[in-house]
Amino acid sequence: MILSGQFQPPSHQLVVYGQPLAQALPRVIRDFWVGQSIIATNTSLAAENGLADKVSDILHETLRNTITGIRERSPREDVMRVAAALRGKGVDAVVSVGGGSVVEAVKAARICLTNNIRNAADLDRLKTTTTAASPRPYLVSVPTTLSGAEFTQFAGITDERTGVKDTFHHKDLAPDVVILDPAATLGTPERLWLSTGLRALDHAVETWCAKEPTPYSDATSLYAVRNLAHWLPITKVAPADLEARLGCQIGGWMAIQGATIGVPHGASHGIGRVLSAMTGMAHGITSCIMLPHVLRYNLPASHDRQAILAQAMGTSGEPLADFLAGMVNNLGLPSRLRDAGVRHDQISAIARAALADARVKANIRELDTEHAMTQLIEAAF
């Protein structure tokens, strides 16, 4: 079959990798002519002598404010707090310090400014349309996990009224600069680091096994799988190994590239999104549990592609799903829904909700009946 399609590169984003934060951040501040800056972070990273303090010392005279307490799943209320701070006169840049929840909140806060969103309910307007104006001020991301949210042009924000996580898009929503300093991740709790590493693998695997992958998404996802399969287990046994942590960061960067050009993920992401909304389960944990089961379900439709990934991960003829399940176990992460707080009586509702998810509908093998979905989730229970 002759390949056919079109390619538009992702956003014009500067990614600085392998350089210490104390070296990279001042150069960014200088190059962007930043006179006033703000830090946005979560409670743990804002602790005394934590990473936010180190960033504060680096920003020095430009720092005007630090917004703390951004919560998991990026609630609308937190988005509005950040937006209010960004409205301050003369703010040129915001530095997000933390994982996906922090950077998602800041990404959304920036489009609140360009769309004159003044309260949480007003965010509903952005579900259908946003101004073409590029988000401002500049956003510099210092990620501490492997979620990949710092590379995408969309933000998932939780509506506290419904518990639903809405997605907001803008072509320029991704941060202007991402600084991948492995030392900045040393304080990340082990379970969070490793589970977001599995999430990154899920990004890469489902991109590679998508219905309509592209040459770009194939190249980046295959690179990601090789990197993460090699380096992530090393960070379990040698958590201070900066080379291994940087290898994971680069793997996470490559893993999400398919999503940045519109290659849809599949049922692992779709079911995971529902699990997160209905049970509060972290996205990384949903990937640990669901990805092997989805791969087994998809095997008739993606056998050859799964075999290539298994080989790239260094398996000796072992099925990809089994290899990943073993990896989850070796990393000490949950592999069953019941071990992550899901009750058996929730399965039917989860199955029904998952059938409506766009990622499930994009799955490489049809998964469109309640019976099939329930069987799949039961297998993971």
Model-identified regions with their sequence ranges:
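Active-site segments that bind and position negatively charged phosphate/pyrophosphate groups
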Residues: 207-323
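Glycine/serine-rich anion-binding loops at beta->alpha junctions
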Residues: 91-107, 144-149, 278
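C-terminal charged capping/lid subdomain of soluble metabolic enzymes
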Residues: 310, 314-381
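ATP/NTP phosphate-donor binding region
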Residues: 1-93, 337, 371
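Short alpha-helical scaffolding segments that buttress acidic/His motifs in well-ordered protein cores
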Residues: 201-205, 248-256, 291, 324, ...
